[in-house]
Amino acid sequence: MRVTDFSFELPESLIAHYPMPERSSCRLLSLDGPTGALTHGTFTDLLDKLNPGDLLVFNNTRVIPARLFGRKASGGKIEVLVERMLDDKRILAHIRASKAPKPGAELLLGDDESINATMTARHGALFEVEFNDDRSVLDILNSIGHMPLPPYIDRPDEDADRELYQTVYSEKPGAVAAPTAGLHFDEPLLEKLRAKGVEMAFVTLHVGAGTFQPVRVDTIEDHIMHSEYAEVPQDVVDAVLATKARGNRVIAVGTTSVRSLESAAQAAKNDLIEPFFDDTQIFIYPGFQYKVVDALVTNFHLPESTLIMLVSAFAGYQHTMNAYKAAVEEKYRFFSYGDAMFITYNPQAINERVGE
């Protein structure tokens, strides 16, 4: 399969730079997986699309202010993007500098360069950095870090992004990108869903900066997926199995929830799904056999990204590309702060030929 098969024309004007004033007021494009039929509406229509007893699975990761500015003690400017927090003192990070720092290099971080850190080791493209400070890594980031807005949101981060680029149910700090499908849920909508009898469960996948890395190969099968840490606890497993047993649907909110659930299913030895606490490199593209997820809430993704490949594997390649074409024609807002889709599973997707 060629990466270019997943390309589409997107006018720059359709990239959302700010969210809607009200989280749940965005538009919703519904795609019926089996038929490819499209329905246009608003996000709160989700209430009518879900049945009592259906299970919504959210990702409760919380975005950390992961972008730091500063300089090497030797002089050159640097930009640090945290990939993950290793412990209370150390991070693994991408570092942009005219010349990469060497192990032992001293870094002065923060807009006022008040935080002292040392680059201790290099692991491929990533740098291990240790803070020489009494405070925890999280406290330091909250104090001097900037929200790591995606590269296509072409503006500096603002104070408001600390809440706007965060789901209302976020709980566990560690992501450098928001699980954006969840941004559309506000408390009133969650309350109405609960009142209808829709069940809810929470996985954790700390989204890494790798989610924005372009696919740099021509053939999809050659792509090496970045690694992210995911947790699917026992209560989620129990909820999924109970939902399936009563004939209801498991609905993933966001591709990160999909990847968490399907990783746990892949690793399971004795049941459909078992608890999972590990790094995952799961790469979902057409031909993938979904085991757990029956429906998906997701935003509109970048051309040629691994995420549009995941959606194509779920809904079918042709149905997905047709939906994106319609979304562009109807001027839906794209990417992290944009509009959403509700997609039901297409069991025929696994047999579809792509790009022919």
Swiss-Prot record:
Q: Which Pfam families match?
A: Queuosine_synth (PF02547)
Q: Does the keyword Cytoplasm apply?
A: yes
Which cellular component terms (GO) are annotated to the entry?
A: cytoplasm
The keyword Magnesium belongs to this UniProt entry's keyword annotation: no
Q: Which UniProt keywords apply?
A: Cytoplasm, Queuosine biosynthesis, S-adenosyl-L-methionine, Transferase
List GO molecular-function terms, semicolon-separated: S-adenosylmethionine:tRNA ribosyltransferase-isomerase activity
Reaction catalysed by this enzyme: 7-aminomethyl-7-carbaguanosine(34) in tRNA + S-adenosyl-L-methionine = epoxyqueuosine(34) in tRNA + adenine + L-methionine + 2 H(+)
| UniProt-listed Enzyme Commission number(s) | 2.4.99.17
Q: What class of enzyme is it?
A: transferase
Tell me, in a sentence or two, what this protein's role is: Transfers and isomerizes the ribose moiety from AdoMet to the 7-aminomethyl group of 7-deazaguanine (preQ1-tRNA) to give epoxyqueuosine (oQ-tRNA).
Q: How does it assemble?
A: Monomer.
Listed name of the protein: S-adenosylmethionine:tRNA ribosyltransferase-isomerase
Source species of the chain: Escherichia fergusonii (strain ATCC 35469 / DSM 13698 / CCUG 18766 / IAM 14443 / JCM 21226 / LMG 7866 / NBRC 102419 / NCTC 12128 / CDC 0568-73)
Q: Which gene specifies this protein's sequence?
A: queA
